[in-house]
From Swiss-Prot:
The gene is frmA. It comes from the Bacteria. Has high formaldehyde dehydrogenase activity in the presence of glutathione and catalyzes the oxidation of normal alcohols in a reaction that is not GSH-dependent. In addition, hemithiolacetals other than those formed from GSH, including omega-thiol fatty acids, also are substrates. Also acts as a S-nitroso-glutathione reductase by catalyzing the NADH-dependent reduction of S-nitrosoglutathione. Binds 2 Zn(2+) ions per subunit. It catalyses: S-(hydroxymethyl)glutathione + NADP(+) = S-formylglutathione + NADPH + H(+); S-(hydroxymethyl)glutathione + NAD(+) = S-formylglutathione + NADH + H(+); a primary alcohol + NAD(+) = an aldehyde + NADH + H(+); a secondary alcohol + NAD(+) = a ketone + NADH + H(+). Zn(2+) 2 binds at residues 92, 95, 98, 106. Homodimer. Zn(2+) 1 binds at residues 40, 62, 169. GO terms for molecular function: alcohol dehydrogenase (NAD+) activity; S-(hydroxymethyl)glutathione dehydrogenase (NAD+) activity; S-(hydroxymethyl)glutathione dehydrogenase (NADP+) activity; S-nitrosoglutathione reductase (NADH) activity; zinc ion binding. Belongs to the zinc-containing alcohol dehydrogenase family. Class-III subfamily. One of its GO terms (biological process) is formaldehyde catabolic process. It is an enzyme of class 1 (oxidoreductase). This is S-(hydroxymethyl)glutathione dehydrogenase.
Length: 369
């Protein structure tokens, strides 16, 4: 079938809006009509060429919502007409990782997904007869996309796709990191480095967890009003100080902050976040994705004296079994999604959405098909 899509033909170049061909779903696959998709920093990261798994030409997009159109052989968990959110972190329930109960990092489709392919090692997209790669198992920058059954969460059909599409990545990542990775407790202190969608979601999650002091940190003070709306008690612009941000936080508590979250992808900030964590028990959670080949460093003394460095992917949330519940929470108002959507656009305007992101003028732009 034909589908309008925003295709990245080469790194560092604007997306091109073209009509592509989408093949029917094969065994264990599902064809969906995407209704809405967020434009995320991870899409921009891959488009920049810094992503070690980036392949081109590719249909980007991984933060979407849509409706099932057709199912392939053997698919039983969804049917045409079901409302779904594609998952870049699958949940098969059968691999070693799923069976362990210790992680959300299912590996059922990981090997092929990292190569931009469907589980059978081929692609369902083409343009003028030439194959196009998939992206993170989702490719929501196409009006129609094919996704593995294990990479779909079935959601309440009454949910507002313009809002709940954000649960496909950023908001779930931030809120989940608070509850699942850090396990923030009432009264704990929290510092959040970077106030994009993920960082703001961490702030909201910290408020849900009844954290005491919630410190929001960003060099763009225009984000502070929204941070306060989500629950920040303090907002700090590092540029307002003539000393490192670590020292600013240690002035607040000389022993450090109970939980720090790095939501940028800057290895220097990752170190600052760790070294701002509380002596004896502080945790620092890395959420931001650093560039290819970059490494983190600190003195071992920081860990010997009780600090813990952790990472979090998709907030530790298991997509098929747990994400539908988060959609219900959003519908009840327990998760506030509307403020994240600062702009809505058509697919034809998608390059403008990337510009707004790079200029720091948006939190999330949602593309409506």
């Amino acid at each position: 079938m034909k589908s309008r899509a925003a295709v990245a033909f080469a790194p560092g170049k604007p997306l091109e809006i073209v009509e592509i061909d989408v093949a029917p779903p094969k065994k264990g696959e599902v064809l969906i009509k995407v209704t809405h998709t967020g434009v995320c920093h991870t899409d921009a990261f891959t488009l920049s060429g810094d992503d070690p798994e980036g392949v081109f030409p590719v249909v980007l997009g991984h933060e979407g919502a849509g409706v099932v159109v057709e199912v392939g052989e053997g698919v039983t968990s969804v049917k045409p007409g079901d409302h779904v959110i594609p998952l870049y972190t699958a949940e098969c329930g059968e691999c070693e990782f799923c069976r362990s109960g210790k992680t959300n990092l299912c590996v059922a489709v990981r090997e092929t997904q990292g190569k931009g392919l469907m589980p059978d090692g081929t692609t369902r997209f083409s343009y003028n007869g030439q194959p196009l790669y998939h992206y993170m198992g989702c490719s929501t920058f196409s009006e129609y996309t094919v996704v593995a059954e294990v990479s779909l969460a079935k959601i309440n059909p009454e949910a507002n796709h313009e809002h709940v599409c954000l649960l496909g990545c950023g908001v779930t990542t931030g809120i989940g990191a608070v509850h699942n990775t850090a396990k923030v407790q009432p009264g704990d202190s929290v510092a959040v480095f970077g106030l994009g969608a993920i960082g703001l979601a961490v702030v909201q999650g910290a408020r849900q967890a009844k954290a005491g002091r919630i410190i929001a940190i960003d060099t763009n003070p225009k984000k502070f009003d929204l941070a306060r709306r989500f629950g920040a008690t303090d907002c700090i612009n590092p540029n307002d100080y003539d000393k490192p941000i670590k020292d600013v936080l240690l002035d607040i508590n000389k022993w450090g902050i109970d939980h720090t979250f790095e939501c940028i992808g800057n290895v220097n900030v990752m170190r600052a976040a760790l070294e701002s964590a509380h002596r004896g028990w502080g945790q620092s959670v890395i959420i931001g994705v650093a560039g290819s080949g970059q490494e983190i460093s600190t003195r071992p003394f920081q860990l010997v004296t009780g600090r813990v460095w952790k990472g979090s992917a998709f907030g530790g949330v298991k997509g098929r079994s747990q994400l539908p519940g988060m959609v219900e929470d959003a519908m009840k108002g327990d998760i506030d999604l509307e403020p994240f959507v600062t702009h809505t656009m058509s697919l034809d305007e998608i390059n403008d959405a990337f510009d707004l992101m790079h200029e720091g003028k948006s939190i999330r732009t949602v593309i409506r098909y």
